[in-house]
């Protein structure tokens, strides 16, 4: 793996190199000084100094920056006291603080070189921070920021309720996804997860604990949602719920024509009576697709399905679900049949299965366990996630799937539309300026140190895709963006940069929080970097 790690190390050290070349002297805190300073704090939890390596790893597995200490908070006051102590050290201190959820960041965004990493799952484990479900006319759940969504789901299902909007993978923390957006196949109807939050509890960069909502401290509320951790650490969230179904009809069909595929998707998300979950995938040069499906799905027509050949083709998979309860099975069958009759998929490729609601939502974890068993989970993940306007998605697809990725890819490719009206433009999330845009995710893995399975190969393809978008007016925005300079971030935010910067100076004026996003250097450093 040595060949795969070399460019990552260079990437992580880029900022330090810039400082050295610019003649800037960077004071690195002596560990004994850090220990003494932090040890004076009275905490419900504790600091540790021997698990720094674990806090310097993430899902992306391409960047490793060691912190000076890891905070295992036993209360919100622990988080606040720690941030407040760093704030009191002032501009001369290089100490920063990063909240780490389940470590699913892609390029060190949850890391803090020489700083403090807050292990948010420790906060969730504290008894006083338990998940609390409330029914009534406006059902909601109060959940710790460090709680995993899968645990939130288990708790809400006990009350026959569930959050409305999800991510595809549930073993992520509440605060982590709300700091980005949180998108899955329900977003066309309910918006991303950040559009389904009623209230937040936040520790700001000044060490203040603030409760905020649409009505109270609303500027901080909207700043933190999709705010990449720049304005505060989300320690608790109140999330809207809906009645949870017992079962899900899970459907997959294939298309050979991109235009037909996207037209059908757009038709479905525009309809009031439609499926509950709508996602699309691009499948490049895969053999035996339908045979693979047979392990979990059954074909509508086994004979036709057995004659279908996928070799050497670019195909498009539409994945759909309809929720139902056991006594509604007949009605569900009728509604599914009526909706499918309007679609123009390849008739021999209709596959379906019925699973529990929990089983469907936690589907990616099943794949995770298989990959872990094969040693293929903890490998580099050079992902690229784009938001593409509807007006340019065909131009994008022709170049990317017809030329750049025509031979192969090393992971799933997501492609599905969402409605802009379901996204709240008061949050910090940046999206294209069109009513319909597509989420396109290239979820690559790099299990090899060379060749097609390497980080270098995946990054080369990613760079070609981004370069095409930038040079041909595609109007894309990156989601989970891996930018490393403030210049890139300014271009990303565009006209919204001024608001983003104002909020930063208001809630985290010393740039203590989330240094791994590489947006605002610590206040003692030159802002030009």
UniProtKB/Swiss-Prot annotation:
Catalytic activity: N(6)-dimethylallyladenine + A + H2O = 3-methyl-2-butenal + adenine + AH2
Glycosylation sites (chain numbering): 285, 419, 425
Residue positions binding FAD: 99, 101, 103, 105, 109, 168, 173, 179, 183, 234, 479, 517
Molecular function terms, GO-annotated: cytokinin dehydrogenase activity; FAD binding; oxidoreductase activity
Chief location of this protein within or outside the cell: secreted
Tissue expression: Expressed in inflorescence meristems.
Residues annotated as domain FAD-binding PCMH-type: 63-244
Swiss-Prot/TrEMBL GO biological process terms: cytokinin metabolic process
EC number: 1.5.99.12
Pfam families assigned: Cytokin-bind, FAD_binding_4
Residues that bear Pros-8alpha-FAD histidine: 104
A GO cellular component entry from the record: extracellular region
Subunit: Monomer.
Family: Belongs to the oxygen-dependent FAD-linked oxidoreductase family.
PANTHER family membership: CYTOKININ DEHYDROGENASE 6, GULONOLACTONE OXIDASE
Biological function: Catalyzes the oxidation of cytokinins, a family of N(6)-substituted adenine derivatives that are plant hormones, where the substituent is an isopentenyl group.
Name of the protein: Cytokinin dehydrogenase 4
